[in-house]
């Protein structure tokens, strides 16, 4: 069965590259009008140009810091101006904020805060922003990209990252319970290791050949996932095929 988002309005955060880019193009190519936001202006513009080459002309790029409530509110107001509501929210913005793993006694409060701000606060503010429009329309889809780190031990070794990703999963469960009576589903996808952005690429290189080999051996499918693998899972969960699925976290990790 084909998945269509004709007539739907979607917001994707962290849309400039990797998983966010794949999700943006996946939604747009299936008929959605997508408001793609990020703080990386050059990468965001490149993503839109790439979409134009494949007829994904319904992508509207916006520079938005998801930790800034005023900017999130303005984005939701603009995106919902036409139809009166936002149908789909996909929160991809997050990551390790340029950090690397270190002993807990060396972690600063600011480092801890930076990761929680973009991962957990950002997802909270975006969900908070779209909830009224979804309630008014009687339906909606909220999807948060978490991580396998939120379900187990982070390969990054970054305490705040593992904690923030676990926090996202807790937020998903709570919002699913709260928003379900309004016809709104809330789910998350927990990717395995994906070489989808500069941070994950640095991590891959730092593993060295032996570390890379061990990682691959622990994946039953014996390959790394691609951004499109994550996007495909998202397409299903935000579609009409998943109207009875909420509060769930889908691991997309090759069986690891």
Give residue ranges: language-model regions.
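Canonical Rossmann dinucleotide-binding motif of NAD(H)/NADP(H)-dependent dehydrogenases/reductases
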Residues: 3-35
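Substrate-binding pocket helix/loop in short-chain dehydrogenase/reductase
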Residues: 100-104, 108-113, 215
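Active-site helix of classical SDR
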Residues: 127, 164, 172
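Alpha-helical segment proximal to the catalytic Tyr-Lys
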Residues: 132, 151, 177-178, 243
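Residue(s) in the substrate-gating loop at a strand-loop-helix junction
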Residues: 147
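Short, small/polar-rich loop/turn modules that mediate ligand/substrate recognition or access, typified
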Residues: 180, 185, 190, 245-247
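A glycine/serine/threonine-rich, flexible loop-to-helix segment
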Residues: 181, 193-219
